């Protein structure tokens, strides 16, 4: 699965796509594995692998974009948080930690926090007790020093996620797009449009400044309607990609992986029709 993810990432990035991976499923360092290595190397080497793939696949100097995330409950989350502190490491990816309410409560109360793997198991194979406050302070320090990791308040995201009511149909949110604007399920894609709030201010920088809410509401409706058309346009482009793959000179064995990848993306786009209409320029109002 780890190698398949890398291959799919490369295939997407060669078409100028960005990718978000959640690494919570990877065994923590030292865990037993059923191969000649005997134990797992943990998260960090795979962070490097995906980062290197991102830097290597470029078009005219423009490389792909990558988001790597992990749950704070994962025993290797501290190593994940520290991974970019060494200069030159994981330079091809943004990294973000998925923070739970339980962890934040432990931070506030200065209590120990139990990490485990698998993170959602009632019978984990690995457990580890840590100081929640110390790890939180490390997150804050590293973000101050190197601008990463980002923080995803995951329980809040899931509580406010409408698509997760269809989690049993394949729409369970697992990570975000590379810039973190929209949490998504596997093989879905981000389609984003922002409304400039400053443009709705009437008589700006005066005592009579006010926000044109009626115009904003009208444009929000139009924006959502436009984004619905964008989904159809995207599926047309995916059809073109699928047609090109069919006519590529490589043998079917080579082409099949990319072809099936785009089939999965098209299916998810058609079923979910996800859009991201947001706002910008709030600070300029």
PLM regions and their residue ranges:
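Active-site cavity-forming subdomains of large catalytic enzyme subunits
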Residues: 1-219, 223, 232-246, 261-268
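Extended glycan-interaction surfaces of carbohydrate-active proteins
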Residues: 230, 252-258
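Internal transmembrane alpha-helices of multipass membrane proteins
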Residues: 245-248, 254
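Extended, well-ordered alpha-helical scaffold/bundle regions in very large, multi-domain proteins
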Residues: 264, 271-285
